[in-house]
Amino acid sequence: MRKILSIAAAVCLLVGCQCRRGSAPAPVVLPKAEPVSVETVFSAEPIPASVEARMRGVSYPDDAEIKLSDLRYLRLSYVDFNGDEQVGELVCNKAIAEDLVAIFRDLYEARYPIRSIRLIDDFGGDDEASMAADNTSCFNYRKKTGMRELSKHALGLAVDINPFENPYVRPSRVRPAGASAYADRTKDFPHKIDKEDLCYKLFRAHGFSWGGTWRSVQDYQHFEK
């Protein structure tokens, strides 16, 4: 018996274990898990049936003058405000689909932060709600703000980027509500679009005009073609 105990003690010393009665076992150290990656995608395709079902009666009314065949459904990778990679959705006119895929690919590669890219239908087609959520969007069959004329958004030819930090500004009103602090463009703050901003430069390089240079109103979120 003494011989067995001596052997056990020797083994304990060799492996460095703690042989005290009641002592807890050492924790098992597992390999560190690899982070889960989000797929990188930049695609444009005709409007799928599932997306059409989401749009009808919301962003796409029954009396819309533009055909669904003239629109494209885009899936776009982007980096959100937390630095996390996401995949968003846009619907746009087929005439600018390639431009937008190229622009958003460049923004992604530069890790340009965008808070959200979701279809306006996720907000019931409500532009104010989408802007208040700082959501980047494109197609929405609606009229220009305060006017009878159709917006370029109704044709899928306009994109609003990070709208809360880049609001629509009139002398008497700022949209979205609550974004007045971002109306003064002489101030520096994160996510501001100006002529030195990468987003501005990319859209201009692809032939888009910017609402930030309009005279009667300024729409700093807005790019159209």
Segments from the language model and where they lie:
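Hydrophobic core
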Residues: 13-14
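Sec-dependent signal peptide recognition
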Residues: 2-10
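Catalytic cores and adjacent binding grooves of peptidoglycan-active enzymes
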Residues: 36, 143-150, 155-225
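Active-site acidic/histidine clusters and adjacent loop/turn architecture
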Residues: 66-131
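Structured segments of extracytoplasmic/periplasmic soluble domains
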Residues: 79, 99-113, 142, 164-167, ...
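Active-site-adjacent loop/helix surface patches within enzyme catalytic domains
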Residues: 118-155, 166-168
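N-terminal module-boundary/linker segments of secreted carbohydrate-active enzymes
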Residues: 25-84
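N-terminal Sec signal peptide cleavage junction
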Residues: 17-19
